[in-house]
Amino acid sequence: MDAGKLRRGDRLAPIADSCRRLHAGRRFLHDFDMFEIQPRYLAIVLERGFRLPARYEEFEPQIRELERAMRVHPEPTVPCNNDLLAENFIDVGGEMRLIDYEYSGNNEPSFELGNVWSESNLSPEQLEELVAHYYGSPLRNKVARARLWGLMSKYGWTLWGSIQDGISDLDFDFWGWAMEKYERAVEELDGPEFRRLLSDVQRED
């Protein structure tokens, strides 16, 4: 699978099904929480003197506000892949299979949906459809939760890219990869919908 095919929209129901199958399985040994991972990555970047995007730390108060809003009605954690770029879905006769469990751990289901949305640049309407396939209807608080997890994912993985840019010998533009994530995160943090999403995620639908 690739992001272009995923954006066509006809694979959203099978993707939701594949996530539900994984989430119904046995729990992993470890948890995965981007609100805990991102500060650790930031500490490494600052300690080692790696490159940090302009204004990155300026958004930290908003990120902590985001975390507080998300903690109001946390979802029960389930076994998650946590790295749902399109290439980690394999279409087997119309059924989507998941591969690459390097970052697997127990996490909220909505993180997975937000990760799918973010990694493949789906539209907000496609995220609503994905949420509806997973939960049975496009609940406002779940849509907001998935979108905010997608935002937090981009903000956190930016630092992973910065670290790799500083230490990796691979012939890959990790900084460019990180900046693509970061610029999209900034667009959302500076955007007009951020406050509404913080409100929606605290609803009880």
Positions of PLM-derived features:
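ATP-binding pocket architecture of kinase catalytic cores
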Residues: M1-E36, A43-E57
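Alpha-helical transmembrane segments of integral membrane proteins
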Residues: R11, R145-L151
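Charged catalytic carboxylate motif
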Residues: P14, S18, E58, Q62, ...
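A general structural signal marking secondary-structure boundaries and capping sites
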Residues: C19-H30, M70, S120, P138, ...
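Active-site catalytic-loop/activation-segment of kinase and kinase-like phosphoryl-transfer enzymes
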Residues: M34-R71, E125, E180-V186
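ATP/Mg2+ or Mg2+-diphosphate-binding catalytic cores
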Residues: F50-A54, L159-D205
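Active-site acidic catalytic loop and adjacent metal/ATP-binding pocket
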Residues: E67-L113
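Active-site activation/catalytic loop segments of kinase-like enzymes and analogous catalytic loops
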Residues: P109-R140, L151-D169, R184
